[in-house]
């Protein structure tokens, strides 16, 4: 049974947001509201059938974000760099500004560390560095926020980097290369982490979970 706390999930039809929405729904403790540009999509309909409230909205429209956040206790947000590229920062800033204007009690924001800063300027990873810039902006607003930094998705081996069958019948992965170590996560499990944060937000305030 829910405790009437409404959590808005941004990006609920994507890999991260979908897992978060499903875990929140399965916990039975929250009312889950999912923002999507296309409420009639197959994934949006599946979320609605699972018990979520699905609303139409767009990162590019600040007012639509604020409308979706009305009455919400918390927000989970992620901005997909690979979908938005050079608009990622602008759209992410819209999201953060909407949270700041909406009396949200706790914000969970999926970001990434600053590769350029960590490497002393030797390495630039655009999708990391833009997300880190969004995190820096968010910290400056004094919000009740927790940052989550998910690792490489194991699910990528089922899509972007599938194993290739060799002549001897075995399968080989082409990534990572050589002896390189690769941290990974089943992205569905991120939902469990985010649900735990919303269950005990004071324990995770201003923290970064990697």
Locate the predicted segments by residue.
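Short acidic/histidine-rich motifs immediately flanking catalytic phosphotransfer sites
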Residues: 50, 70-74
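Short, conserved active-site loop motifs that form the nucleotide-linked donor/cofactor pocket
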Residues: 51-52, 145
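Cofactor-binding loops of NAD(P)H-dependent oxidoreductases
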Residues: 57
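Oxidoreductase cofactor-interface core, primarily capturing Rossmann-like NAD(P)-dependent enzymes
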Residues: 2-46, 60-70, 79-90, 98-106, ...
């Amino acid at each position: 049974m829910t405790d009437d706390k409404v959590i808005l999930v941004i990006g609920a039809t994507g890999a991260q947001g979908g897992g978060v929405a499903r875990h929140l729904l399965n916990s039975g403790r929250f009312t889950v509201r999912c923002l999507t540009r296309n409420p009639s999509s197959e994934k949006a309909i599946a979320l609605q059938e699972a018990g979520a409230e699905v609303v139409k909205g767009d990162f590019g429209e600040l007012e639509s974000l604020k409308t979706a956040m009305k009455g919400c206790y918390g927000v989970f947000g992620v901005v997909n760099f690979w979908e938005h590229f050079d608009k990622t920062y602008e759209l992410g800033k819209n999201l953060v500004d909407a949270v700041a204007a909406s009396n949200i009690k706790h914000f969970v924001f999926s970001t990434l560390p600053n590769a350029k800063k960590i490497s002393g300027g030797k390495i630039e990873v655009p999708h990391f560095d833009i997300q880190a810039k969004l995190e820096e902006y968010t910290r400056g607003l004094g919000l009740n926020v927790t940052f989550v930094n998910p690792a490489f998705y194991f699910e990528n081996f089922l899509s972007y980097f599938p194993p290739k069958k060799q002549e001897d019948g075995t399968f080989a992965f082409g990534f990572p290369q050589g002896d390189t170590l690769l941290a990974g996560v089943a992205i569905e499990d991120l939902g469990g982490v985010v649900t735990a944060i919303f269950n005990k937000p004071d324990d995770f305030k201003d923290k970064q979970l990697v």
